[in-house]
Amino acid sequence: MLTLAELARGSAAPPDAASETQTLAAQGVPGLIVPAGFEEAFYRGGNLPEQLRRLFAPIRPARIDEDALEPLAEQAQALIRTTYLMDDAVQDFYRALARAGLPQTVTVRRPGGATGEPAVWAPPGTAALQALKRLWARDWAFEAVLARLDTAGSVALEARPTLLLPT
């Protein structure tokens, strides 16, 4: 994980977040970049790809039953919100959050995203971590899953970086 202050001192930004984060860092905005690999490790550590594959197995992309998809999307969101991160990952997140110099009120969002999940946090950062997982769960909202099925023919998605910024 990389703070925007570290980025301003010359660390490399993730390529899929570089433009926005470099601008914010140059402006002196405090913040934290959670790399896509952190989300990927969460999915792998919780065996989520297999659980999600089994959950969505009844859905056929060629003939989507939206009535069947809706409760599955809700279950997927709950699965993301309730799956635990590995202890080492949680501690890494808390340490990075402490280094970021963020105020107590933050927004957790994707780079380029217009909206995010708000959090009022205090050390160690549990509320910010919960907001991060709520944001990740948005990828499994009915509309998001339906859009992936329509465009890619699959519910699968790629991990992406996440930003924590002052509100």
Which sequence ranges carry the predicted segments?
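N-terminal beta-alpha lobe that positions the nucleotide/phosphoryl donor
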Residues: 1-166
